[in-house]
Amino acid sequence: TCYPGGCVIGRRPIDLHLLALRQLGADIDCECEQITVRADKLQGTDLRLSFPSVGATENALMAAAAAKGVTRIYGAAREPEIEVLCRFLEAMGVRIDGIGGSLLTVHGGERLQDVEFRVPGDRIVAGTYLGALMVAGGELCLLGAPTDHMAGTLTALRQAGCLCKLYPDRIYARMKERPQPMDLSTGPYPEFPTDLQSVMLAVASVAQGRSRIRETVFEERFATAGELKKMGADISVEEGT
């Protein structure tokens, strides 16, 4: 049986998604190669996530908004994308307490309203452009970069020698020399994002010295190393580092 969830970087089970929906009252059938979900009458409840999964938190939030009563989500992910989704649901008329923390309280069951909403800039895309700058050198101005949500990324970039100046709506960055060696570890927000690990691996491959990068989220995220080695990079991978 093959279910959604998973890709070349590692296992991405959907068990937490299904558990949250079941606890809210959804009827879920898993048969053959398909999952059928019926959600006629969702009821608010207490949800406890064993891992701060971004996707499971998002699904729980949206289902809780439609459920009657109060839902408390313990162990919620704290990524900026969760906060943005909460603000979007708030704009539609859902009351949510604890935004930005690991306990979210959703007062659901109200009729949702039409709304116009602006999605902020993507922190991973911004980090990718900055990583490209560190390899190529030169100067870069990123308009619309979500600087408030990039502390972990900017710390790593500065450690490697990138000069970054922050403004309310942009980042000005300059790279004058080859990157310096770095020592970083991935983790849930606000730590360094796993989605930028392969970018920093490319940066480390041209750095002046030995870097150490630890991956704590996805077990196959270092597959990039093999491709960089084909291009001449000196990389060894041992036990997630």
Where are these regions (language model features)?
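Structural preference for solvent-exposed beta-strand-turn elements
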Residues: 1-241
